[in-house]
Amino acid sequence: MNVELQLDPRRTVPAWLAYGTPVLTVLAALAVGGVALVALNVDPVDAYGVMFVETLTSQFGLTEVLVRAVPLILAGLAVYLPLKAGLFNIGAEGQLLLGALAGTWVAVNVSLPAVALLPLMFLAACVAGAFWAGIPAWLRAKWDVNEIITSLLLTFVAQELQSYLLRGPMQGGTGNFPQSARFSDAATLPPLAGLVPGGESIPLFADVHAGLLVAVAAVVATYVVMTKTRLGFEVTFVGSNDEAARQAGMSRHTVYLFVFLLGGAFAALGGIAEIAGSQGRFRAAFAPGYGFTAIPIALLGRNSAVKVTLAGLFFAVLFVGGSSVEVAFGVPAALVEIIQALVILFLITSEFFKRYRVGIAFDRRGNDAPADATGGDARW
């Protein structure tokens, strides 16, 4: 009996595969992560109980999740938008850093009331982030230079620029630490308790800063643009069929610039919101790889901005819960990075199964069987 593996291109993707992929991906990543926990002599049930249940049932845990979700969601949108246009923005980390640097410069050098200073900080951050993201977009639109390479290389440039500025012109505070001067009260984002009607009666809002409102506004704006406007339709059309979009008179150059500029601005907002809301000053490594974590966030939520939000919250839980597991069980902090890598790996695998229908054909005729003998096959 001969066995043959067959790959047939799918004409349509089954609904269960299209919508179930994110859930199956997360479950598979957690399952393999559980194997790693067993290898470390840690009960996966206990560890995941601490990571998820205790984190989401305590006020401190929920507060930390919402605070960490702000830069993660905004950076996730920075990757999600180009992804909808068929592009890959690997440079969200650099755009986040540039936005944080620009906003910090305004915060420590401009003396204005909070009502004017905060918008100016966020505007400066958006301009810097959009400019940094616009470079790979322009190179791709003008000369078809691979945006993955250029956006990634610009991230390294941003990291070196940050190191120089925090040890030179922007260094502040006491000692020789790579950090800026501390933000004034006018440059600090207020808690939600004083901004949301009835917020004073919600204990959680006392420790969650207004950056959460910025993230929510960005998600709503992205959803409206992508689903209710012609430009959003063109972004999706260019991403699904570049050549057909060109023949229909759509400008892919405009689309490329739009998604990168807006995405870079969102990533920059995440950077300055994290500093003005949580840190109080720009410190080196203030955002531990949030821009790179945005990649699996965008891949998980690539169907809509709402799913990007859910993915951002999931990874925020991973960060906060991972720290708790590290303390409770002595598990290395790299566990969260392992789960992130597994999510990306399984997402890439799922894309293969979305594109191809895998089948196994069994030929039972043998060499001496008549020509009309039948075999069998199994496909999924």
UniProtKB/Swiss-Prot annotation:
Mutant phenotype after disruption: Mutant with a disruption within tsgB13 or tsgD13 cannot use glucose for nitrate respirative growth. However, the mutant can grow aerobically using glucose as the sole energy source.
Entry membrane topology: Multi-pass membrane protein
Cross-referenced Pfam families: BPD_transp_2
Sorted UniProt keywords: Cell membrane, Membrane, Plasmid, Sugar transport, Transmembrane, Transmembrane helix, Transport
Chief localization: membrane
Any GO molecular function: transmembrane transporter activity
Subcellular location, record wording: Cell membrane
Domain of life: Archaea
GO CC list: plasma membrane
CDD domains cross-referenced by the UniProt entry: TM_PBP1_transp_TpRbsC_like
TM regions (residue ranges): 20-40, 59-81, 94-114, 115-135, 148-166, 202-222, 255-275, 282-301, 305-325, 328-348
InterPro entries in UniProt: ABC_transp_permease (IPR001851)
PANTHER family referenced in this protein's UniProt entry, alphabetically: ABC TRANSPORTER, PERMEASE PROTEIN (PTHR47089), GUANOSINE ABC TRANSPORTER PERMEASE PROTEIN NUPP (PTHR47089:SF1)
Assigned protein family: Belongs to the binding-protein-dependent transport system permease family.
Purpose: Part of an ABC transporter complex involved in glucose import. Responsible for the translocation of the substrate across the membrane.
Complexes and interactors: The complex is composed of two ATP-binding proteins (TsgD13), two transmembrane proteins (TsgB13 and TsgC13) and a solute-binding protein (TsgA13).
Descriptive protein name: Glucose ABC transporter permease protein TsgB13
Organism: Haloferax volcanii (strain ATCC 29605 / DSM 3757 / JCM 8879 / NBRC 14742 / NCIMB 2012 / VKM B-1768 / DS2)
